[in-house]
């Protein structure tokens, strides 16, 4: 986690008045111990970044996503949940399939408790001049509520 990402998360918590209810921890992927709720918003596209800025968008070979899923159960308290925030843009671009994602979830010993979906309303979703318009017009961002089996 970059220091800038941590500072951004803290700023968001402060603006929402939640800084006293949430503990931010800088760690490689998981902090030591277990938690009742672990939230992950990994880079959405399985590709190699060419700059530090692109590291927020690209996840080579879906390493972070697969690492989060495979380690989640071991870091949750009994009854705890992992929340995965993920766009399906990679699916629309042919970079990953929904079946792959679901297989990684199952292989990690996790179950999907629920999924909340939202369609983007940002300008790129409706910009027909954007080279990715066809994919962005179909994109859905989901909050996957996961728990250990």
Predicted regions and their residues:
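S-adenosylmethionine
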Residues: 3-145
């Amino acid at each position: 986690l970059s220091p800038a990402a941590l500072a951004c998360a803290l700023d968001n918590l402060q603006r929402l008045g939640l800084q006293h209810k949430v503990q931010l921890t800088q760690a490689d992927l998981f902090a030591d111990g277990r938690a009742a709720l672990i939230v992950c918003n990994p880079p959405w596209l399985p590709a190699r970044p060419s700059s530090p800025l692109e590291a927020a968008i690209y996840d080579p070979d879906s390493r972070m996503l697969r690492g989060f899923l495979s380690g989640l159960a071991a870091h949750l308290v009994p009854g705890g949940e992992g929340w995965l925030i993920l766009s399906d843009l990679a699916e629309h671009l042919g970079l990953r399939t929904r079946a792959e994602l679901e297989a990684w979830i199952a292989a990690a010993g996790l179950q999907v408790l629920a999924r909340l979906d939202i369609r983007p309303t940002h300008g790129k979703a409706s910009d027909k001049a954007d080279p990715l318009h066809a994919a962005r017009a179909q994109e859905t961002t989901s909050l996957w509520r996961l728990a250990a089996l």
